[in-house]
Amino acid sequence: MKRPLLFFLMLAISIYSRAGDRLSALPYPILGGELSNSATTSVEDIDEVMPRMKALGLNTVLVPAYWELMEPVEGQFDFTLIDRTIDVARQEQLHVIFLWFGVWKNSMSCYAPGWFKQDTKRFPRAATAEGKPMEIASCFSDNVLQADLKAFSALMKHIKERDPQREVVIMMQIENEIGMLESARDHSPLAEKAYQKERWAERYGTDDYADEQFMALYYARYVEHLAKAARQIHDMPLYVNAAMNSRGRRPGEYPSAGPLAHLIDFWHEGAPSIDLLAPDIYDTGFKSWAAQYAMPQRPQDGGKVKNRLFIPESRCCENSGVRALYAFGEHQALGFSPFAIDQASSAETSSVTKAYALLRQIFNYQSSIFNSKTWGLLFDQEDKERVIDDNGVVMTCRHFFTLPWDPRATDGSVWPEGGAMLIRLGKYDYLLAGSGVVVDFKTPTEKQQEQQKLLGEDGFAEAGNTPGQSSKAGKRFHGKRLGLLSVDEVKVDSEGKLKYLRRHNGDQSHQGRHARISVGDWKLLHIRLYEYE
């Protein structure tokens, strides 16, 4: 089947340049949390929930803006909830990202006002291939667009009046998890007219993925109208979020045609005013999903970053903290935000609070931290090890439970994820921030001659022929080695300087063999190396 990708590959360099300027103007990396859908539907709820978000260590709260409550009568706007959110956030010294629950929320038009929902002739619905009308307004209807555009523009104007310097509201999400369900594309009369006009089937084929590409382009063009209007009213970063195409589903089984990684060129072509496409990550494979949205510089984009990673929704769980550290370390993420953090248990939010406390210190220590070389580590029971070669320093990074000393490592327990942000400060000089990881450091020649030995719980090699022992055993060692000069637990003080807390040596470094942070501990380690032979 023909693919229309070549048509979309060469996008205007200026689009990425302007987006980069807007994103670089954000006050800091976003240590966020998204509120549950109904958390701010009254001023009493807002007054209660926002201080709790501050106490959890967030610097930014992602808050729904509900069309049905903002325009209950057509043409009559009520900004009470918006105003209260801005006022309380300002009082709590929090930033806000408003989520426009307009025509679409999780594909459906459930947050459209009653007057919109009931007038299906004026505001037509999308239809499946079998002609079944969906509770999804059709993006091919100009009436739908104009109603949505009018309300969103009114919201942007009001935000500009209340917060003209962007002291509180720093970014806007347009719609929420756009996508067609049950069919790969809309088959309503208006959609069919556009489909025939494009001669899409003739040019690109008729399978589900060709249909999805058609739908993605039209969803993006729809969003562009809102983004362009917003940009003219109050210029700030704008993004759209996506429900992932996971679990082997086909378009329509997952929300088809949303801002998915495999459709990014269609979305960039149709909605050039959008700064970010953002993944909502709930399924397994966190690292893989994140990597699809961290799109580095490419020659065809004029050397500009194609898409910065921002995760506006992720399952709030006991692994959230190490996932945040991974996202910032590996991909220099713009931000991270667990979903429904207001409803999460203390066990689930604890990891977020502790990880964010470490990240605040790191960003305070070196505001331009992403000018340094950084890595993200994230391990579980299946994915236990990563080897990094940093210009002659080979770092073997592993899950803490690869050491035999904790009984949970071998008693059949499910391992919690371990993860960290690893930062090169200079030659033989590193910071490690995280939980549940162990890192050793070797020269390349030392690593090549390494003898793999299983350790007993006393830290010494098991007796006899250890499984996996290198065939190089008995050969004379040659070359230089790296040793730990010091491993210090530190914190960053109010002046942005490293402050010594304690030395990790002896048993805490396995007599100089590695740096480690136990599962359940959250630490910032300053590691210095030296070379010897």
Spans of model-derived segments:
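Short, basic, low-complexity termini and linkers enriched in Ser/Thr/Gly/Pro
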Residues: 10-15, 19, 367-369
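N-terminal carbohydrate-binding accessory modules
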Residues: 19-59
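The substrate-binding groove and active-site-proximal loops of carbohydrate-active enzymes
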Residues: 31-42, 64-82, 130-150, 162, ...
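Aromatic-lined substrate-binding rim segments of carbohydrate-active enzymes
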Residues: 46-121, 219-235
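Polysaccharide-binding and catalytic clefts of secreted carbohydrate-active enzymes
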Residues: 122-264
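Catalytic-core region of carbohydrate-active enzymes that cleave or remodel glycosidic bonds
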Residues: 225-235, 262-373
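Aromatic- and carboxylate-lined catalytic core of secreted/periplasmic carbohydrate-active enzymes
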Residues: 322-448, 458-459, 468
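C-terminal beta-sandwich/jelly-roll accessory domains of carbohydrate-active enzymes
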Residues: 407-414, 431-533
